From Swiss-Prot:
This is Protein AF-9. Residues 138-476 are annotated as: Disordered. The lineage of its organism: Eukaryota, Metazoa, Chordata, Craniata, Vertebrata. It comes from Mus musculus. Coiled coil: none annotated. Residues 1-138 form the YEATS domain. InterPro entries: AF-9_AHD, YEAST_sf, YEATS_dom, YEATS_domain. Residues 202-265, 323-350 have a biased composition (Basic and acidic residues). There is a cross-link at K340 (Glycyl lysine isopeptide (Lys-Gly) (interchain with G-Cter in SUMO2)). The gene is Mllt3. PROSITE patterns: YEATS. Ubiquitously expressed. Strong expression in the spleen.
Length: 569
């Protein structure tokens, strides 16, 4: 392993890709070319026996072998994928080949053409004399230590000339690695070989993170090729002017979930005898229909991680609620009470949730519906489904008439109307949705959520912060929504007709008020556990909803006892 016996050679792996002016009949939208070469056009053929490109299986003859330079493959497609490249050495002893998993990513239309260059440094320790001579002929650097730091070279931003990307080597990687704003990017890594057949990769694939963001999720359909692999590899031009036309589906460009990642930083140890960095077959990015699902999962995952981080830095717990007055008996104060509660809620919203400006009025279902559609389109995260599920689960107040008129009409309805509405309620017990303007009592809901969910889950009430993930077992970013409209089970109807008088309603209002001020996470966890035992709850992807009025008195008493303990602690 002495440095005096080490020879270092460099390989450049890269690809160029640009959007075609017109898609082909098969729907191909990009022309691309991938290559392996020596730096500054040094002749790596001296020590390279052949280069094998393992294209995706959807291509005809996916295994492309290039025995003579230029070692390149030109194709058309509309998909990015991980392309395993095997470089075989003219070496009688191990190592006889090295494998790289190359990320052949494509840019979307409107972005600059891709011109990516990846520099690989191969250090052979104690090579045989014959192989050493071959390495030196190919521009190998003798007497180099295996710990030589990797340097990176930058390719030129031109993508029309096949030799353009080797012309510049002085640009910094940091500027060239941002593939979203520049059409060229570069990276470097170092590989060392020794007699014990170990291969050490020190990967510094700087643009891989950025480039993955621009990968397109699509599938490479089959394409007939009458040329031999040798002919296609020798073809000098990189952009084929194919004239077939077909409009490619718009959904073809979805952000994918990267199936196979390039080697990560700092020394993945691999045995050269296998010659494989990764046994996986090249993973194809899924077609448009599946890519939506995968990209949604990816966004959910990243959003969940972001929410998890925000939980740890969020305040212990802040609860707000759009609780309208439950009592109807005292009609003279209802209007004032409503205005007061709404103003209090909006004050709480401003003081407790300063970052969120777009919380909708709880009575404005039109805004609410717009909001849910907006959040679905703009925020494809786990929170995005909560607005639609909440708005469908929470009875809307304005689907029949204007919000204030319908509410005031109900508030001033007589007791007979209330009783007849209760009878209707009995028929609607099994339904989770029903207009709130029945019986004059309007729904009150407590939504517990972390701050990042506020815009999309604001369906019909202001939001509040959720405690960290341990609060809810089902999901680490779920919303706990406590609803108490006058939807009641039949047993609760009997209670209402008999025992459940104004005093009980007062208790529920008080319970709601105390839930608003509750901040102890362990108490909230107890509440969730209790509601789970009753079975009277509804779980969507992002919410945990339950109805206070559907709970029996025993459960309500337990809730009150939890609040008592929180008050004394």
């Amino acid at each position: 392993m002495a440095s005096s016996c080490a020879v270092q050679v460099k390989l450049e792996l890269g690809h160029r890709a640009q959007v075609r002016k017109k898609p082909t009949v098969e729907g191909f939208t990009h022309d691309w070319m991938v290559f392996v070469r020596g730096p500054e056009h040094s002749n790596i053929q001296h020590f390279v026996e052949k280069v094998v490109f393992h294209l995706h299986e959807s291509f005809p003859r996916p295994k492309r072998v290039c025995k003579d330079p230029p070692y390149k493959v030109e194709e058309s497609g509309y998909a990015g994928f991980i392309l395993p490249i095997e470089v075989y050495f003219k070496n009688k002893e191990e190592p006889k080949k090295v494998r790289f998993d190359y990320d052949l990513f494509l840019h979307l239309e409107g972005h600059p053409p891709v011109n990516h260059l990846r520099c690989e440094k191969l250090t052979f320790n104690n090579p045989t004399e014959d192989f050493r001579r071959k390495l030196l002929k190919a521009g190998g650097d003798p007497n180099r230590s295996i710990h030589t730091s990797s340097s990176s070279s930058s390719s030129s931003s031109s993508s029309s000339s096949s030799s353009s990307s080797s012309s510049s080597s002085s640009s910094s990687s940091s500027s060239s690695s941002s593939s979203s704003s520049s059409s060229s990017s570069s990276s470097s890594s170092s590989t060392s070989f020794s007699k014990p057949h170990k291969l050490m990769k020190e990967h510094k694939e700087k643009p891989s993170k950025d480039s993955r963001e621009h990968k397109s999720a699509f599938k490479e359909p089959s394409r007939d090729h009458n040329k031999s692999s040798k002919d296609s590899s020798k073809k000098p031009k990189e952009n084929k002017p194919l004239k077939e036309e077909k409009i490619v589906p718009k959904m073809a460009f979805k952000e994918p979930k990267p199936m196979s990642k390039e080697p990560k930083a700092d020394s993945n140890l691999l045995t050269v005898t296998s010659g494989q960095q990764d046994k996986k077959a090249p993973s194809k990015r899924p077609p448009a229909s599946d890519s939506e699902e995968l990209s949604a999962k990816k966004r959910k995952k990243s959003s969940s991680e972001a929410l998890f981080k925000s939980f740890s830095s969020a305040p212990p717990l802040i609860l707000t609620c759009s609780a309208d007055k439950k009592q109807i008996k005292d009609k003279s104060h209802v209007k004032m009470g409503k205005v007061k509660i709404e103003s209090e809620t909006s004050e709480k919203k401003k003081s407790m949730l300063p970052p969120f400006d777009d919380i909708v009025d709880p009575n404005d279902s039109d805004v609410e519906e717009n909001m849910s559609s907006k959040s679905d389109s703009e925020q494809p995260s786990p929170a995005s489904s909560s607005s639609s599920s909440s708005s469908s689960f929470t009875p809307s107040q304005t689907r029949q008439q204007g919000p204030l008129r319908s509410i005031m009409k109900d508030l001033h309805s007589d007791d007979n109307e209330e009783e007849s509405d209760e009878a209707e309620d009995n028929d609607n017990d099994s339904e989770m949705e029903r207009p709130v303007n029945r019986g004059g009592s309007r729904s009150r809901r407590v939504s517990l959520s972390d701050g990042s969910d506020s815009e999309s889950s604001s369906a019909s009430s202001p939001l509040h912060h959720e405690p960290p993930p341990p609060l809810l077992k089902t999901n680490n970013n779920q919303i706990l929504e406590v609803k108490s409209p006058i939807k009641q089970s039949k047993s609760d109807k009997q209670i209402k007709n008999g025992e459940c008088d104004k005093a009980y309603l007062d208790e529920l209002v008080e319970l709601h008020r105390r839930l608003m001020t509750l901040r102890e996470r362990h108490i909230l966890q107890q509440i969730v556990n209790l509601i789970e035992e009753t079975g009277h709850f509804h779980i969507t992807n992002t919410t945990f909803d339950f109805d206070l009025c559907s709970l029996d008195k025993t459960t309500v008493r337990k809730l009150q006892s939890y609040l008592e303990t929180s008050g004394t602690s």
